[in-house]
Structure formats: C-alpha cells, structure tokens
Amino acid sequence: MSKGYVWVVDDDSSIRWVMEKTSPLPT
C-alpha cells in the first residue's frame, strides 16, 4: 500500500493525490 506516497510526504495535497491514484476510494 506504500508504493506511491513515499516522495509526496512533503505536501498534504500530494498525499491525497497519490492515495487517489494508488487506491481509488469513493471519497
């Protein structure tokens, strides 16, 4: 599950972006 947001841990927007890309959850 941690194979995308390892380099985007510096911004909040980036984290939610990668999470949506790696795990398409119905938010």
Curated annotation (Swiss-Prot):
The keyword Transmembrane helix does not apply. One of its GO terms (cellular component) is cytoplasm. It is found in: Cytoplasm. Keywords: Activator, ATP-binding, Cytoplasm, DNA-binding, Nitrogen fixation, Nucleotide-binding, Phosphoprotein, Repressor, Transcription, Transcription regulation, Two-component regulatory system. Its main location: cytoplasm. One of its GO terms (molecular function) is DNA binding. Phosphorylated and dephosphorylated by NtrB. It comes from the Bacteria. GO terms for biological process: nitrogen fixation; phosphorelay signal transduction system. Transmembrane segments: none annotated. Member of the two-component regulatory system NtrB/NtrC, which controls expression of the nitrogen-regulated (ntr) genes in response to nitrogen limitation. Phosphorylated NtrC binds directly to DNA and stimulates the formation of open promoter-sigma54-RNA polymerase complexes. This is DNA-binding transcriptional regulator NtrC. It comes from Vibrio alginolyticus. The lineage of its organism: Bacteria, Pseudomonadati, Pseudomonadota, Gammaproteobacteria, Vibrionales.
